[in-house]
Swiss-Prot record:
Leading EC class: ligase
Biological classification of the source: Bacteria, Pseudomonadati, Pseudomonadota, Gammaproteobacteria, Enterobacterales
Reaction catalyzed: tRNA(Tyr) + L-tyrosine + ATP = L-tyrosyl-tRNA(Tyr) + AMP + diphosphate + H(+)
Motif ('KMSKS' region): 235-239
Residues that bind L-tyrosine: Y37, Y175, Q179
Protein name stated in the entry: Tyrosine--tRNA ligase
Major localisation: cytoplasm
GO CC entries: cytosol
Protein role: Catalyzes the attachment of tyrosine to tRNA(Tyr) in a two-step reaction: tyrosine is first activated by ATP to form Tyr-AMP and then transferred to the acceptor end of tRNA(Tyr).
Assembly: Homodimer.
Record-listed E.C. numbers: 6.1.1.1
Ranges that cross the membrane: none
Localization, UniProt: Cytoplasm
Gene: tyrS
Protein backbone atom coordinates (compact mmCIF):
# COMPACT_ATOMS: atom_id res chain seq x y z
CA UNK A 1 0.00 0.00 0.00
CA UNK A 2 1.22 3.49 -0.79
CA UNK A 3 0.97 6.21 1.82
CA UNK A 4 -0.46 8.90 -0.46
CA UNK A 5 -3.93 7.40 -0.63
CA UNK A 6 -3.85 4.91 2.23
CA UNK A 7 -7.28 5.72 3.69
CA UNK A 8 -8.94 5.22 0.31
CA UNK A 9 -7.12 1.90 -0.15
CA UNK A 10 -8.26 0.72 3.28
CA UNK A 11 -11.83 1.76 2.46
CA UNK A 12 -11.71 -0.21 -0.79
CA UNK A 13 -10.86 -3.31 1.26
CA UNK A 14 -13.77 -2.61 3.65
CA UNK A 15 -11.35 -1.93 6.50
CA UNK A 16 -12.65 1.44 7.69
CA UNK A 17 -15.71 1.64 9.95
CA UNK A 18 -15.26 5.22 11.21
CA UNK A 19 -12.60 7.88 10.94
CA UNK A 20 -12.29 11.30 12.57
CA UNK A 21 -11.78 14.22 10.17
CA UNK A 22 -11.04 12.00 7.20
CA UNK A 23 -9.87 14.80 4.89
CA UNK A 24 -7.44 16.20 7.46
CA UNK A 25 -6.05 12.73 8.21
CA UNK A 26 -5.61 11.95 4.50
CA UNK A 27 -3.80 15.26 4.07
CA UNK A 28 -1.55 14.54 7.06
CA UNK A 29 -0.68 11.08 5.72
CA UNK A 30 0.16 12.58 2.33
CA UNK A 31 2.66 14.95 3.97
CA UNK A 32 4.86 12.11 5.23
CA UNK A 33 5.15 9.28 7.74
CA UNK A 34 3.28 9.43 11.05
CA UNK A 35 3.35 7.32 14.20
CA UNK A 36 0.18 5.42 15.08
CA UNK A 37 -0.82 2.93 17.72
CA UNK A 38 -3.21 0.14 18.55
CA UNK A 39 -3.77 -1.25 22.03
CA UNK A 40 -4.13 -4.89 23.05
CA UNK A 41 -5.35 -5.61 26.58
CA UNK A 42 -4.17 -8.86 28.22
CA UNK A 43 -7.62 -10.19 29.13
CA UNK A 44 -6.44 -13.72 28.26
CA UNK A 45 -3.12 -15.43 27.68
CA UNK A 46 -3.46 -15.14 23.90
CA UNK A 47 -4.87 -12.89 21.22
CA UNK A 48 -7.72 -14.31 19.14
CA UNK A 49 -8.97 -13.77 15.59
CA UNK A 50 -10.86 -10.64 16.63
CA UNK A 51 -7.50 -8.94 17.24
CA UNK A 52 -6.09 -9.88 13.85
CA UNK A 53 -7.72 -7.17 11.70
CA UNK A 54 -6.42 -4.19 13.75
CA UNK A 55 -3.03 -5.91 14.14
CA UNK A 56 -2.76 -6.38 10.38
CA UNK A 57 -3.92 -2.79 9.94
CA UNK A 58 -0.86 -1.69 11.94
CA UNK A 59 1.25 -3.74 9.54
CA UNK A 60 -0.44 -2.15 6.51
CA UNK A 61 0.51 1.29 7.82
CA UNK A 62 4.09 0.16 8.44
CA UNK A 63 4.38 -1.22 4.91
CA UNK A 64 3.26 2.23 3.70
CA UNK A 65 6.16 3.84 5.59
CA UNK A 66 4.54 4.77 8.91
CA UNK A 67 5.75 3.85 12.39
CA UNK A 68 3.48 1.52 14.39
CA UNK A 69 3.35 1.36 18.17
CA UNK A 70 1.94 -1.86 19.63
CA UNK A 71 0.65 -1.04 23.11
CA UNK A 72 0.01 -3.90 25.51
CA UNK A 73 -2.22 -2.79 28.36
CA UNK A 74 -0.47 -3.95 31.50
CA UNK A 75 -2.49 -1.37 33.46
CA UNK A 76 -5.80 -1.34 31.56
CA UNK A 77 -5.74 -5.15 31.49
CA UNK A 78 -6.06 -5.13 35.28
CA UNK A 79 -9.41 -3.33 34.97
CA UNK A 80 -11.03 -4.51 31.75
CA UNK A 81 -12.77 -2.54 29.03
CA UNK A 82 -16.54 -2.40 29.63
CA UNK A 83 -17.27 -1.44 26.01
CA UNK A 84 -20.35 -3.37 24.87
CA UNK A 85 -19.83 -6.08 27.50
CA UNK A 86 -23.01 -7.38 29.14
CA UNK A 87 -21.44 -7.71 32.57
CA UNK A 88 -18.31 -6.79 34.50
CA UNK A 89 -15.13 -8.63 33.63
CA UNK A 90 -13.42 -10.79 36.21
CA UNK A 91 -10.41 -8.99 37.72
CA UNK A 92 -7.18 -10.94 37.31
CA UNK A 93 -4.19 -10.84 39.65
CA UNK A 94 -1.21 -8.65 38.88
CA UNK A 95 1.01 -11.71 38.38
CA UNK A 96 -1.47 -13.20 35.90
CA UNK A 97 -1.76 -9.94 33.95
CA UNK A 98 2.03 -9.54 33.82
CA UNK A 99 2.39 -13.09 32.50
CA UNK A 100 -0.23 -12.43 29.84
CA UNK A 101 1.39 -9.10 28.90
CA UNK A 102 4.62 -10.90 28.05
CA UNK A 103 2.83 -13.61 26.06
CA UNK A 104 0.88 -11.06 24.01
CA UNK A 105 3.98 -8.92 23.44
CA UNK A 106 5.72 -11.98 21.98
CA UNK A 107 2.64 -12.80 19.90
CA UNK A 108 2.43 -9.32 18.36
CA UNK A 109 6.14 -9.03 17.57
CA UNK A 110 6.34 -11.27 14.45
CA UNK A 111 3.71 -9.19 12.65
CA UNK A 112 5.73 -5.96 12.78
CA UNK A 113 9.30 -5.01 11.85
CA UNK A 114 11.21 -3.67 14.84
CA UNK A 115 14.43 -3.09 12.89
CA UNK A 116 13.75 -1.26 9.64
CA UNK A 117 15.08 2.25 10.20
CA UNK A 118 12.94 5.31 10.83
CA UNK A 119 9.63 3.46 10.85
CA UNK A 120 10.75 0.59 13.09
CA UNK A 121 7.90 -0.59 15.29
CA UNK A 122 7.79 0.25 19.00
CA UNK A 123 6.46 -1.98 21.79
CA UNK A 124 4.92 -0.15 24.76
CA UNK A 125 3.18 -1.06 28.02
CA UNK A 126 0.84 1.42 29.68
CA UNK A 127 1.80 0.12 33.13
CA UNK A 128 4.98 2.17 32.61
CA UNK A 129 3.05 5.42 33.14
CA UNK A 130 0.16 4.22 35.28
CA UNK A 131 2.08 1.94 37.65
CA UNK A 132 3.57 4.77 39.70
CA UNK A 133 0.69 7.26 39.41
CA UNK A 134 -1.26 7.98 42.61
CA UNK A 135 -4.98 8.60 42.72
CA UNK A 136 -4.65 12.36 43.42
CA UNK A 137 -2.48 12.86 40.34
CA UNK A 138 -4.95 10.83 38.29
CA UNK A 139 -7.93 12.90 39.44
CA UNK A 140 -6.17 16.28 39.16
CA UNK A 141 -4.33 15.79 35.87
CA UNK A 142 -6.69 13.50 33.98
CA UNK A 143 -10.10 13.36 35.65
CA UNK A 144 -10.65 17.13 35.57
CA UNK A 145 -10.73 17.08 31.76
CA UNK A 146 -13.69 14.70 31.56
CA UNK A 147 -17.38 15.47 31.80
CA UNK A 148 -19.41 12.74 33.49
CA UNK A 149 -22.41 13.90 31.44
CA UNK A 150 -20.54 13.09 28.22
CA UNK A 151 -19.12 9.85 29.56
CA UNK A 152 -22.50 8.37 30.49
CA UNK A 153 -23.84 9.31 27.07
CA UNK A 154 -21.27 7.16 25.29
CA UNK A 155 -23.10 4.22 23.72
CA UNK A 156 -20.92 1.57 25.35
CA UNK A 157 -21.67 2.95 28.83
CA UNK A 158 -25.35 3.63 28.15
CA UNK A 159 -25.95 0.00 27.26
CA UNK A 160 -24.63 -1.11 30.64
CA UNK A 161 -26.52 1.57 32.59
CA UNK A 162 -29.79 0.60 30.92
CA UNK A 163 -29.55 -3.07 31.88
CA UNK A 164 -31.76 -4.10 34.81
CA UNK A 165 -29.51 -6.97 35.90
CA UNK A 166 -26.18 -5.10 36.01
CA UNK A 167 -24.90 -1.56 36.07
CA UNK A 168 -21.29 -0.49 35.76
CA UNK A 169 -18.71 -0.15 38.52
CA UNK A 170 -16.61 2.98 39.00
CA UNK A 171 -13.59 0.82 38.12
CA UNK A 172 -14.87 -0.01 34.65
CA UNK A 173 -16.38 3.46 34.24
CA UNK A 174 -12.85 4.86 34.67
CA UNK A 175 -11.42 2.69 31.89
CA UNK A 176 -12.27 5.36 29.32
CA UNK A 177 -9.97 7.84 31.11
CA UNK A 178 -7.08 5.40 31.18
CA UNK A 179 -7.23 4.61 27.48
CA UNK A 180 -7.59 8.31 26.68
CA UNK A 181 -4.43 9.05 28.66
CA UNK A 182 -2.59 6.32 26.73
CA UNK A 183 -3.10 8.36 23.55
CA UNK A 184 -1.85 11.55 25.22
CA UNK A 185 1.24 9.78 26.64
CA UNK A 186 2.14 8.14 23.34
CA UNK A 187 1.66 11.45 21.55
CA UNK A 188 4.11 13.13 23.90
CA UNK A 189 6.66 10.29 23.94
CA UNK A 190 6.57 9.15 20.31
CA UNK A 191 4.60 11.78 18.42
CA UNK A 192 1.72 9.33 17.90
CA UNK A 193 -0.95 11.05 15.80
CA UNK A 194 -3.40 8.22 15.09
CA UNK A 195 -5.08 5.49 17.11
CA UNK A 196 -6.68 2.52 15.40
CA UNK A 197 -8.92 -0.11 16.95
CA UNK A 198 -12.11 -2.10 16.57
CA UNK A 199 -15.34 -0.20 16.07
CA UNK A 200 -16.28 -0.91 19.71
CA UNK A 201 -13.37 1.38 20.67
CA UNK A 202 -14.78 4.51 19.04
CA UNK A 203 -15.82 6.15 22.31
CA UNK A 204 -12.44 5.46 23.94
CA UNK A 205 -10.57 6.75 20.88
CA UNK A 206 -12.50 10.02 20.67
CA UNK A 207 -11.89 10.58 24.39
CA UNK A 208 -8.17 10.19 23.74
CA UNK A 209 -8.31 12.69 20.90
CA UNK A 210 -10.02 15.26 23.16
CA UNK A 211 -7.58 14.69 26.04
CA UNK A 212 -4.51 14.94 23.79
CA UNK A 213 -5.79 18.24 22.44
CA UNK A 214 -6.37 19.57 25.95
CA UNK A 215 -3.04 18.40 27.41
CA UNK A 216 -0.69 18.92 24.46
CA UNK A 217 -2.59 21.16 22.03
CA UNK A 218 -2.05 18.58 19.29
CA UNK A 219 -4.45 17.52 16.56
CA UNK A 220 -4.63 13.74 16.47
CA UNK A 221 -6.93 11.28 14.73
CA UNK A 222 -8.82 8.03 15.17
CA UNK A 223 -9.75 5.23 12.80
CA UNK A 224 -11.74 2.10 13.56
CA UNK A 225 -11.89 -1.15 11.65
CA UNK A 226 -15.21 -3.00 11.45
CA UNK A 227 -16.12 -5.83 13.79
CA UNK A 228 -16.21 -8.79 11.44
CA UNK A 229 -19.48 -10.66 10.97
CA UNK A 230 -20.32 -13.57 8.70
CA UNK A 231 -22.84 -13.36 5.88
CA UNK A 232 -25.28 -15.56 7.80
CA UNK A 233 -25.23 -13.13 10.73
CA UNK A 234 -23.33 -15.40 13.13
CA UNK A 235 -20.24 -14.32 15.04
CA UNK A 236 -16.92 -14.47 13.26
CA UNK A 237 -13.96 -16.18 14.93
CA UNK A 238 -15.97 -18.67 16.96
CA UNK A 239 -16.26 -22.43 16.60
CA UNK A 240 -18.23 -25.00 18.57
CA UNK A 241 -15.17 -25.24 20.79
CA UNK A 242 -15.02 -21.49 21.45
CA UNK A 243 -12.70 -18.75 20.24
CA UNK A 244 -10.04 -19.31 17.58
CA UNK A 245 -6.76 -18.27 19.24
CA UNK A 246 -3.46 -17.21 17.71
CA UNK A 247 -1.52 -19.29 20.25
CA UNK A 248 -0.80 -22.72 18.67
CA UNK A 249 -1.15 -24.35 22.09
CA UNK A 250 -4.76 -23.13 22.34
CA UNK A 251 -5.76 -23.53 18.67
CA UNK A 252 -3.40 -25.77 16.73
CA UNK A 253 -2.20 -24.77 13.23
CA UNK A 254 -4.30 -27.64 11.81
CA UNK A 255 -7.50 -26.47 13.50
CA UNK A 256 -6.67 -22.87 12.58
CA UNK A 257 -6.20 -23.90 8.93
CA UNK A 258 -9.46 -25.85 8.96
CA UNK A 259 -11.31 -22.81 10.31
CA UNK A 260 -10.38 -20.88 7.16
CA UNK A 261 -10.97 -23.84 4.83
CA UNK A 262 -14.56 -23.94 6.12
CA UNK A 263 -15.22 -20.29 5.25
CA UNK A 264 -18.51 -19.86 3.39
CA UNK A 265 -18.40 -18.85 -0.28
CA UNK A 266 -20.39 -15.74 0.67
CA UNK A 267 -17.58 -14.60 3.00
CA UNK A 268 -14.32 -15.81 1.50
CA UNK A 269 -13.51 -12.98 -0.93
CA UNK A 270 -14.34 -10.35 1.68
CA UNK A 271 -12.09 -12.14 4.17
CA UNK A 272 -9.25 -12.20 1.64
CA UNK A 273 -9.45 -8.39 1.66
CA UNK A 274 -9.46 -8.24 5.47
CA UNK A 275 -6.88 -10.88 6.38
CA UNK A 276 -4.36 -11.04 3.53
CA UNK A 277 -2.07 -8.65 1.70
CA UNK A 278 -3.18 -9.81 -1.75
CA UNK A 279 -4.03 -6.83 -3.93
CA UNK A 280 -7.62 -6.29 -5.00
CA UNK A 281 -6.88 -7.22 -8.61
CA UNK A 282 -5.64 -10.66 -7.49
CA UNK A 283 -8.68 -11.21 -5.27
CA UNK A 284 -11.12 -10.16 -8.00
CA UNK A 285 -9.36 -12.40 -10.54
CA UNK A 286 -9.57 -15.34 -8.13
CA UNK A 287 -13.28 -14.73 -7.60
CA UNK A 288 -13.86 -14.63 -11.36
CA UNK A 289 -11.82 -17.82 -11.82
CA UNK A 290 -13.84 -19.63 -9.13
CA UNK A 291 -17.14 -18.54 -10.68
CA UNK A 292 -16.20 -19.88 -14.10
CA UNK A 293 -14.24 -23.02 -13.20
CA UNK A 294 -17.19 -25.31 -12.56
CA UNK A 295 -15.17 -26.78 -9.68
CA UNK A 296 -14.97 -26.22 -5.94
CA UNK A 297 -13.59 -22.71 -5.32
CA UNK A 298 -9.87 -22.26 -4.70
CA UNK A 299 -10.38 -19.14 -2.57
CA UNK A 300 -10.74 -20.98 0.75
CA UNK A 301 -7.38 -22.72 0.25
CA UNK A 302 -5.70 -19.46 -0.74
CA UNK A 303 -7.15 -17.78 2.37
CA UNK A 304 -6.18 -20.66 4.67
CA UNK A 305 -2.62 -20.79 3.33
CA UNK A 306 -2.12 -17.03 3.56
CA UNK A 307 -3.42 -16.57 7.10
CA UNK A 308 -2.06 -19.80 8.59
CA UNK A 309 1.38 -19.10 7.13
CA UNK A 310 1.31 -15.55 8.45
CA UNK A 311 0.26 -16.56 11.99
CA UNK A 312 2.02 -19.92 12.39
CA UNK A 313 4.89 -19.70 9.91
CA UNK A 314 5.97 -22.13 7.20
CA UNK A 315 6.36 -25.03 9.62
CA UNK A 316 2.88 -24.60 11.10
CA UNK A 317 1.32 -24.29 7.64
CA UNK A 318 3.15 -27.39 6.41
CA UNK A 319 1.87 -29.40 9.40
CA UNK A 320 -1.70 -28.19 8.85
CA UNK A 321 -1.63 -29.12 5.15
CA UNK A 322 0.02 -32.47 5.89
CA UNK A 323 -2.63 -33.47 8.44
CA UNK A 324 -5.44 -32.27 6.16
CA UNK A 325 -4.13 -34.28 3.20
CA UNK A 326 -3.51 -37.38 5.32
CA UNK A 327 -7.00 -37.47 6.82
CA UNK A 328 -8.59 -36.84 3.43
CA UNK A 329 -6.64 -39.57 1.63
CA UNK A 330 -6.40 -42.03 4.52
CA UNK A 331 -2.65 -42.34 3.95
CA UNK A 332 -0.98 -41.48 7.26
CA UNK A 333 2.61 -42.18 6.16
CA UNK A 334 3.55 -38.50 6.01
CA UNK A 335 2.21 -37.61 9.46
CA UNK A 336 4.65 -36.90 12.27
CA UNK A 337 4.30 -37.74 15.95
CA UNK A 338 3.60 -34.04 16.61
CA UNK A 339 0.77 -34.16 14.05
CA UNK A 340 -1.00 -36.86 16.07
CA UNK A 341 -0.53 -34.78 19.21
CA UNK A 342 -2.21 -31.87 17.38
CA UNK A 343 -5.25 -34.03 16.64
CA UNK A 344 -5.58 -34.91 20.32
CA UNK A 345 -5.16 -31.24 21.30
CA UNK A 346 -7.84 -30.20 18.81
CA UNK A 347 -10.47 -32.34 20.45
CA UNK A 348 -10.44 -35.44 18.25
CA UNK A 349 -11.93 -38.16 20.49
CA UNK A 350 -8.96 -39.87 22.14
CA UNK A 351 -8.82 -42.92 24.38
CA UNK A 352 -6.06 -44.75 26.22
CA UNK A 353 -5.88 -48.51 25.81
CA UNK A 354 -3.73 -51.29 27.21
CA UNK A 355 -1.92 -53.31 24.58
CA UNK A 356 -4.03 -56.43 25.05
CA UNK A 357 -7.20 -54.72 23.74
CA UNK A 358 -8.52 -56.04 20.42
CA UNK A 359 -10.27 -54.12 17.63
CA UNK A 360 -13.78 -54.88 18.90
CA UNK A 361 -12.94 -53.58 22.37
CA UNK A 362 -11.26 -50.50 20.91
CA UNK A 363 -14.38 -49.61 18.91
CA UNK A 364 -16.59 -49.99 22.01
CA UNK A 365 -14.24 -47.98 24.25
CA UNK A 366 -13.99 -45.31 21.56
CA UNK A 367 -17.83 -45.12 21.51
CA UNK A 368 -17.77 -45.71 17.77
CA UNK A 369 -20.19 -48.62 18.38
CA UNK A 370 -22.41 -49.48 21.38
CA UNK A 371 -21.40 -53.15 21.77
CA UNK A 372 -18.96 -55.85 20.73
CA UNK A 373 -21.73 -57.42 18.64
CA UNK A 374 -22.23 -54.19 16.74
CA UNK A 375 -18.44 -53.91 16.39
CA UNK A 376 -18.33 -57.34 14.69
CA UNK A 377 -21.04 -56.25 12.26
CA UNK A 378 -19.29 -52.97 11.39
CA UNK A 379 -15.92 -54.68 10.89
CA UNK A 380 -17.40 -57.47 8.74
CA UNK A 381 -19.20 -54.91 6.55
CA UNK A 382 -15.87 -53.21 5.77
CA UNK A 383 -16.86 -50.01 7.61
CA UNK A 384 -13.82 -49.82 9.91
CA UNK A 385 -10.33 -48.56 9.06
CA UNK A 386 -7.11 -48.72 11.08
CA UNK A 387 -4.67 -45.94 10.17
CA UNK A 388 -6.55 -45.46 6.91
CA UNK A 389 -6.54 -49.17 5.96
CA UNK A 390 -9.86 -51.08 5.89
CA UNK A 391 -10.00 -54.06 8.27
CA UNK A 392 -12.68 -56.72 7.73
CA UNK A 393 -11.54 -59.40 10.21
CA UNK A 394 -13.83 -59.16 13.27
CA UNK A 395 -11.27 -61.07 15.36
CA UNK A 396 -8.43 -58.72 14.46
CA UNK A 397 -5.81 -58.09 17.17
CA UNK A 398 -3.59 -55.04 16.92
CA UNK A 399 0.09 -55.45 16.07
CA UNK A 400 3.08 -53.22 16.74
CA UNK A 401 2.85 -52.05 13.13
CA UNK A 402 -0.53 -50.48 13.97
CA UNK A 403 1.05 -48.40 16.74
CA UNK A 404 2.53 -45.46 14.86
CA UNK A 405 5.53 -44.00 16.68
CA UNK A 406 4.93 -46.79 19.17
CA UNK A 407 1.89 -45.08 20.65
CA UNK A 408 -0.81 -43.87 18.20
CA UNK A 409 -3.50 -45.67 16.20
CA UNK A 410 -6.21 -43.83 14.28
CA UNK A 411 -9.57 -45.61 14.07
CA UNK A 412 -12.26 -44.60 11.63
CA UNK A 413 -15.85 -45.83 11.37
CA UNK A 414 -17.49 -44.89 8.11
CA UNK A 415 -16.14 -41.75 6.50
CA UNK A 416 -16.30 -39.18 9.28
CA UNK A 417 -16.17 -40.82 12.72
CA UNK A 418 -12.65 -40.88 14.15
CA UNK A 419 -10.99 -41.84 17.40
CA UNK A 420 -7.31 -41.67 18.25
CA UNK A 421 -5.91 -44.46 20.43
CA UNK A 422 -3.02 -43.62 22.72
CA UNK A 423 -1.48 -46.92 23.79
CA UNK A 424 -0.37 -47.40 27.38
Amino acid sequence: MTSSNLIKQLQERGLVAQVTDEDALAERLAQGPISLYCGFDPTADSLHLGHLVPLLCLKRFQLAGHRPVALVGGATGMIGDPSFKASERKLNTEDTVNEWVEKIRRQVSPFLDFDCGDNSAIAANNYDWFGGMNVLTFLRDIGKHFSVNQMINKEAVKQRLNRDDSGISFTEFSYNLLQAYDFACLNKAHGVALQIGGSDQWGNITSGIDLTRRLHQQQVYGLTVPLITKADGTKFGKTEGGAVWLDPKKTSPYKFYQFWINTADADVYRFLKFFTFMNLEEINALEEEDKNSGKAPRAQYVLAENVTGMVHGEEGLAAAKRITASLFSGDLNDMTEADFAQLAQDGMPTIELTRDADLQQALVNAELVPSRGQARTMISSNAVAINGEKQSDPEYAFTDADRLFGRYTLLRRGKKHYCLISWL
